[in-house]
């Protein structure tokens, strides 16, 4: 029989823990039955069958598809900033439809439960554990902690679960012990389709023995001297000189761990994102100049990279599996670094020491390639490599990077073929993320990021197989629509709506349009004129030492990665593809994505009309979702005066349970109705359906049924009607609502412009010499207007013109008319 205890491992810095020794958690081995624990509805019982040692243990049985189990310890005093280790034995004999968690419940002095910096719960998730196993769960208590308890809870909708627990021990660790303490890693595995041996053999036959290379080595002076004659070469060399003269900020372990303490991503990532553009610039400058003066800095940075504990962004290593060398896996950042290293190795060739080149290959294999190869061979996907069967940009970006590294670095043709086979499987998942009409719910930025890498992958594979494998042919009808999205989503040639997590200045990257021009010219309405090779393929990031952040200086590159495009576009002639398209052509009068749920209306040939509008339906469970059904962007020329505010600055909470507490993510920060005091709900059932779509030369009319976006029992009807009078340059937005009983109702206009009320219900929005006149009215009661600044981390901050009925209404209409005069 085990003695119930709380282990207190103390130092003078942790005297607060000493106070809690008088209140130890009772009955951690369950030998006293339920003493010290609070049970639930019969799902959690103490019984002999669940004992690991002694006579009794805890058994959780859950066959309830509605709610989970609940078994909680007594509460004891605790202290902020203290690292606690819960050690216990567990046995879950079979896989189930759900999971179970062991939680730390940290509370503040008000009794409120505290969350992690990213807004998530402090929990340790368990799935199948066929044999009894001792596990460690380690957490550091958050700020304002005054107490803790242990909670064992099977997740809602779990069925078929039997889980046994016994012999818990709770320890308060010293700072020295906390440095090396970590939770036991329990990989959650899901099936991944395995390619057949026959298909792998077919792919192997397509591969030459010679490895693919992302461009020629430096000693191909004909190619590099031709690039050196490019006017942009001097700019690149000048940037490289500036990089040499600027002290390099180290990426320390302390900076890496800062995210896990604070949830702030930028502390590490502002420095992290300097590495690639800087070393790319140094490497290309060295190849152009061929004097050796940039080589020492390149070698030093590559050696430092090899010695780093993790190549990931900390936000993608939340359990510190990479950092603690428990499990390596690839993310956006590490796979980008791998591609960068692979490319620099190919270009600089024997300028790099052979020992360094071998070390680089070993690190790429260990950190990136081997974990993926394990999935291909086992058919089991660890949770950390979720992107391999994901449907968003991560899939295309990481698959491109991983496949390119394999094709360039693995001598064995059969193994290269295994990566191609895995790529084919992942590609199918990625393409299901697009709607049938080609719409990308992630928004324009991530369309360019994901689809751009997919097109780069297609060119890479085509080159690496000597033209034998073209991954674009199998899905050509859908891919043509996805390619067309880049044009159809544009309001003007210089403006796209920043729906989802997009920057306000979002626009299709030129590199992506050039790749589309190669393979899908019919998806473009006009020519994409190539700049000089170095001009459009090299990174344009600079570091602002005063602001302590990396500044993006132009849309020249694929956000996190630039070398993939350089290897494809930088050594050829894109003019031959451009010649097949007209020099210029107007955008169509309208674009409609029926399954994506977006309408774009433009002036067409009416030179007197400068208005355009993008109106969004869709649903509230999209990739990079915002609760924004009914949101719209209304522009005068290239200036959006009614604006979707785009993405919030990313933090540890951006993709957690706290996401929709941010105004830019929830409906408060969008130009949509505020109904009965409630915001829009989240989820697939929250949907905006276009019930009317009428398009003509003179007028477009669309109606969205928005009722399903709000969880309000009294709501009978809510529609938004947009009328685009192309001939007279007038846009009208009309919101119609009906309740079963009187309720509060209003709507809003969000803008970055100056907002001025000229008369009751008449407003002027003005920015950058463009002006929008707005008349807001209703015959169903007086309206109240209120301009407030939205709470957000972005700058400048958008403002919200609230438009609300003074009194509750049963049936009402609000009409907003927009003109330029």
State where each predicted segment sits.
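Extracellular carbohydrate-recognition regions
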Residues: 20-41, 169, 177-178
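CBM-like, beta-strand-rich accessory domains located in the C-terminal region of large
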Residues: 19-21, 335, 544, 549-560, ...
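Active-site lining segments of carbohydrate-active enzymes
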Residues: 321-445, 456, 574-582
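Carbohydrate-active enzyme catalytic cores, enriched for enzymes
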Residues: 455-641, 695-697, 705, 806-808
